[in-house]
Amino acid sequence: MGCWVENLWGFAPNALAWVDPLGLYGYYELYKNGKLVYRGITERKVIERIMEHAGDCKDFDDARYIEGLKNYRAARDMEGSGLWHDWDTDKNKDMLNKKRKIVKGYYHSYHKDKFTNNKDKDGRTFLTKKQISDRMKNATPLTQSEKKQG
């Protein structure tokens, strides 16, 4: 996907096109040559967020996404758990997500001792690699025309 920026700001002629009025969230994964390079969530239409990444010069050539997740936590569980698995191995040094310091605002999402399925902890639900992979089996891939737009 190329990088062409004509306008660094924008006006939303239809605000509902940028934000889901039902409050649903989406989760997406970006790929380069078949390798996962980015995980993200959004409360807007996922395809528009993916196109923003293309405009921001993120280096990817494919994407898969799930829309209509019931809330922020459901989307964040997938993103946070996935990133924890990614960053726990040296083979994923090329991930485009920013690694974050262990600070209060993010600690509960990435540290295995703070997940809700860890007895007596209050935090997010930690998903296994298999659980994430199983959910992504039904994810929507980018169409050829969407790939050309980016």
Ranges and model annotations:
Residues 1-25:
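Short turn/helix-capping motifs enriched in Asx and small/polar residues
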Residues 26-32, 36, 44-150:
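Boundary/linker segments flanking structured domains
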